[in-house]
Regions:
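Exposed beta-strand-loop-beta-strand "reactive/processing" segments of non-cytosolic proteins
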Residues: 22-52, 58-59
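Short, non-transmembrane alpha-helical segments in secretory-pathway proteins
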Residues: 1-21
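Short, low-complexity, Pro/Ser/Thr/Gly-rich segments in the mature regions of secreted, periplasmic
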Residues: 57-66
Length: 66
């Protein structure tokens, strides 16, 4: 199926963590499911790993990255 543009989903993620910086973003595909994996450095200095469903923008994972 179609996937949403990364830029659109990044805005959603950056609104969740204002003042954060994007470290890395990549599109992954497993079993015909596309997932954006995004790493952010929050304003508090914490790295967060966020996974979004690329087809509908659903948040799949949001946790501190060690």
């Amino acid at each position: 199926g179609a996937i949403l543009p990364l830029e659109q989903l990044l805005q959603q993620v950056l609104q969740r963590y204002p003042g954060s910086k994007l470290l890395e973003a990549e599109l992954e595909e497993k079993h015909d499911v596309y997932v954006y994996e995004v790493e952010l450095l929050t304003s508090a200095g914490i790295v967060r790993e966020i996974k979004l469903d690329a087809s509908d923008g659903r948040l799949l994972k949001d946790e501190e990255d060690d």
